[in-house]
Amino acid sequence: MGYHSTSETASNTADFLVRLKDFLVGTVGWTLRDDRSGDAEPSYVLASPGESGAEDIFLRFVNDSAVDRIAVRAYLYWDAATHTGVKEAFHTSYTYIKTVDASAFLYWIYADMDHVFIVTKIAAVYYAHYCGLLKRF
C-alpha cells in the first residue's frame, strides 16, 4: 500500500491525539491494540503487521499534557489485557510530537503500515516526528 496523508487543524493536544488515532486506524489500517483514553494521561497503543504483513509494530501515543506534547513509545509486543509492553524503545525526552494545549495548531500526517511521519506547526515553528520501522542493514 502507498502512503496516506492528511493535514488539518487540531484544537489542542487531546484533540490531536484522537485525530491521530482515528487517521492511523480508520484510513491507514493500523489496529487499535489498547485504548487508555480514560487514564489521567490518555494513551492509545496501535499495532501494525507492516507493509510486508510479517512485522510486529507496536506504538504507544501518550498525552503528556503537562509539557504540551504526545510522548511516543515503541514496543516489541503489547499485552492489552495487562496494559503493559515488552522491550520498550524510544523512551527518552526526545521521542515526542510537539503540541500545544492553549491554542489550535496545524498538523500534517504521512503514514503507511511501516512508518508514521508527523509535522506540527506551533506558532511560526515546524516540528517533525518519525516513528515506525527503522531501515535494516
List where the protein language model places each region:
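Long, leucine/valine-rich, helix-dominated scaffolding and oligomerization segments
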Residues: H4-F137
